[in-house]
Amino acid sequence: MKFGIIVGAVSGLALCASAATAQVCQGDLSFRSSRTHLGAALAMSSNTTSFGGGATVGHRQGLYAGGSVGVSSYNGLSGNAVAVNGGLGYSMPLQQKSSWQICPGGTLSLGFGPSQTVGGGTMHFSSQTMTLGASVGTAVPMTKTVSILPFGSAAWGYTRATAKLNGNSATDTDGYLLIGGGAGFQLTPSLVLRPSITLLAGANPGTDNTIFGLSATFALPH
């Protein structure tokens, strides 16, 4: 059961990774006024809570990339897991002169821990989560400084988790579809708050299939 929690929960780390590589198509700030953004993200599901922070660099259109570090805690397991996340995307108009953007891209999360005492030994968990997909979004101005940034996304996700104890190891894998959506609230030209929800389809039984997220992004001045 505990091993299943690890496999099902680490997919939430993908949210922290994607928050470190966001664009308008993902409900976040454009790189028009600043090429460097700092971000923080929180992701919650039935069995886990994950949070992290990182930085992104990119262009208004074209390539953008980022990295982050996150920490996860799990129900029923002592200790925390640390994850190193990265992502890469490409932003482009949905069609010529359209205000909508589409961004194909992917993320990779490497998880380390937690460790559990089992009998006279220590069981060490590790995980790898990868996503490949695309997102679509736009900016809707409300006032001179405030905009709403609605977005939707779809991605394929794959998680591999390993448990090692006394020289023996066991591995489990899971592949699934991630359907996401939400809206960023651009409160100032350099600050966005972004609530989101991600649903997993086709995952193994017992997997957390609903993940709630909240992220904040701040654009560094030139």
What annotation goes with each model-predicted range?
Residues 36-40, 49-53, 63, 82-86, ...:
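Hydrophobic, lipid-facing positions within transmembrane beta-strands of outer-membrane proteins
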Residues 32, 39-43, 54, 66-70, ...:
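Transmembrane beta-strands of outer-membrane beta-barrel proteins
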